Amino acid sequence: MMMPSHNVRILVATQPVDFRKGHDGLAALVQSVLREAPFTGTVFVFRAKRADRLKILFWDGSGLVMAYKRLEETTFTWPAVRNGVMTLNRAQFEALFAGLDWRKVRALETRRPAAAE
């Protein structure tokens, strides 16, 4: 999956959205409903009413990128439906995108060394 930098912020809209929306419709939803800025490089993940579909929207510096995925034989594991957004780390997002249960994924804690040895 092509994505912006490794340290990207990933937000999942927990409420299903109308999947007829394209780039502009989803960007407007990010601003009006999620109260976020769509042109910051943040990755926004949207779900359809059917749990087997997702859309991803992010700004890559020169334009809005939108990806759509439909699973053939299973459904995505989604958070409980409620108003708002939730944050995923990169490892959890990759598990979600692969159709795996992202709730079982924990990223390793990374920290910058204080000094070279």
Where are the predicted features?
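Polybasic/polar functional segments that serve as interface/processing modules
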Residues: M1-E117
